[in-house]
Amino acid sequence: MAAPLLHTRLPGDAAASSSAVKKLGASRTGISNMRALENDFFNSPPRKTVRFGGTVTEVLLKYKKGETNDFELLKNQLLDPDIKDDQIINWLLEFRSSIMYLTKDFEQLISIILRLPWLNRSQTVVEEYLAFLGNLVSAQTVFLRPCLSMIASHFVPPRVIIKEGDVDVSDSDDEDDNLPANFDTCHRALQIIARYVPSTPWFLMPILVEKFPFVRKSERTLECYVHNLLRISVYFPTLRHEILELIIEKLLKLDVNASRQGIEDAEETATQTCGGTDSTEGLFNMDEDEETEHETKAGPERLDQMVHPVAERLDILMSLVLSYMKDVCYVDGKVDNGKTKDLYRDLINIFDKLLLPTHASCHVQFFMFYLCSFKLGFAEAFLEHLWKKLQDPSNPAIIRQAAGNYIGSFLARAKFIPLITVKSCLDLLVNWLHIYLNNQDSGTKAFCDVALHGPFYSACQAVFYTFVFRHKQLLSGNLKEGLQYLQSLNFERIVMSQLNPLKICLPSVVNFFAAITNKYQLVFCYTIIERNNRQMLPVIRSTAGGDSVQICTNPLDTFFPFDPCVLKRSKKFIDPIYQVWEDMSAEELQEFKKPMKKDIVEDEDDDFLKGEVPQNDTVIGITPSSFDTHFRSPSSSVGSPPVLYMQPSPL
């Protein structure tokens, strides 16, 4: 069982919400105690403790003259694995009285001192060691980096390696109950050093980058390190932007190696395995009561665990970041506008640098989704930021298209965005689309081409996708006024244009958009859809003989950034503010059912579509290539609307 770690800092319990302030207060108290200890140490004569006689100062001076025997003996005594607390205290007292002589010539000696096992020792050892660090960096700044590196190395659990001969039979995290206290001490050490050397944060950041564990290290190692980085950002606020950027960069590396499909497959396989009968079950359960009790205690933790190993790491770290964000932005249960605005500035810059250019990341972007839920103003600022990215022709097309993807997904999925904001965004997008079409009417590029008009198609899809998710709200209340508003958007001109967005946008989006607009007689898309489907398809010769037909069902390379979160811990932050697809009632489905046409386009090899085909041959069902029970990115498979490929009834 892992030792408790997060109760000292991160939110989740009542005591933790103001932990940052309390932690700083405790640190200041510790520093005051340190000053008193230092005065006592300096005012009291050093105790003679060197076993070989003389003082450390004399040994150092002899070494400079070429007499190295005592110096080698000194090093050997410091390297003694059985060194006692009193010995460490006495050595540190000696070194503090000789601090002016510990120049760069004694780098090897300082390295040995910095490797002393000072944590998990008596409080006197800890306080004396902290005082030594403060004296060392103030008198010999050349050793600042080694001191910071030593402290950063303690931000992860120590490794316990057990060998049998020359073979490592165990290499695991040491789950010491003192781990949280050791982390507290290390943070005190950093703050003490910073008091002596104000430029400490500037030297610290490269070390934190260097010491970041490899992303395939254990979940516990990554959790501890990220936890400690977030704590550093509290008392070194100048480092917050760089620390958050570092963490999110590492999260992205995990994210791109844990696709939704892979996570879902792993969970499904595990569920099927657990649901089956295990022939070996109970074979080695010597004490059934003990086993049952163990499973009961471990139950809640195991329910939150991800089967996919990379997803497990990602989920733990994502939940840490989301907890940290809430802890920073909320003061006494209320959003602090100033603190939230500062954090928003940091995160939007990181979003532009890391997230927007990254294609098909699954979960990391939810940090922006969560932050925007704190107050509507931040959601509107995020939308405005994305809108500027989309319409700015100086931005690369891939960035503009990504901005369109984010706008559509955010408007559709963010439960905290009111209808008036949705309508304002639709007005902006649709007006821009009409202006774009105006500029193409007399041009030579007025034809369907993703390479030429990628941002246009991305904006179209954002409009269609938002409309599909929000059409009930747009038409609720006064149906007549709702229809008048939708008619004012003039979808027909966009759909009928020579740029032919219905050919480029995802079939799942197009077909549901067509069904809804047909129902309310806003625009009739089926003629265009049929014409697009009848166009000549590329035929590729198969090496095994015969011809094969391949269709690109996602020419826009679309993904929906805010598809449902499937990380179990992180979902708890997102679900309350997340708009899931509401399944249609039987009556609503009946309204959409149309006679089936026999010439529906065959399967289009797209793993976006995994829905069940209705068995009723008289009703148009799901074309396997265009829909599934989950209206999501092409790489996804769960969590959204069933999309029926509908054709108008024959006259």
From Swiss-Prot:
One Gene Ontology term of the molecular function aspect: RNA polymerase I core binding
Any one Gene Ontology BP term: transcription initiation at RNA polymerase I promoter
Positions of region (Disordered): 624-651
Location of the region described as Interaction with EIF3L in the Swiss-Prot/TrEMBL record: 557-651
Pfam family, one: RRN3
Cellular component GO terms held in the UniProt record: nucleolus; nucleoplasm; nucleus
InterPro entries listed in its UniProt record: RNA_pol_I_trans_ini_fac_RRN3 (IPR007991)
Phosphothreonine: residues carrying this PTM: T200
Modified residues (Phosphoserine): S170, S172, S640
Segments for region (Interaction with POLR1F): 500-651
Subcellular location: Nucleus, Nucleolus
Family: Belongs to the RRN3 family.
Subunit organization: Part of Pol I pre-initiation complex (PIC), in which Pol I core assembles with RRN3 and promoter-bound UTBF and SL1/TIF-IB complex. Interacts with POLR1F, EIF3L, TAF1B and TAF1C.
Function: Required for efficient transcription initiation by RNA polymerase I (Pol I). Required for the formation of the competent pre-initiation complex (PIC).
Record's protein name: RNA polymerase I-specific transcription initiation factor RRN3
Species classification: Eukaryota, Metazoa, Chordata, Craniata, Vertebrata
Gene transcribed to yield this protein: RRN3
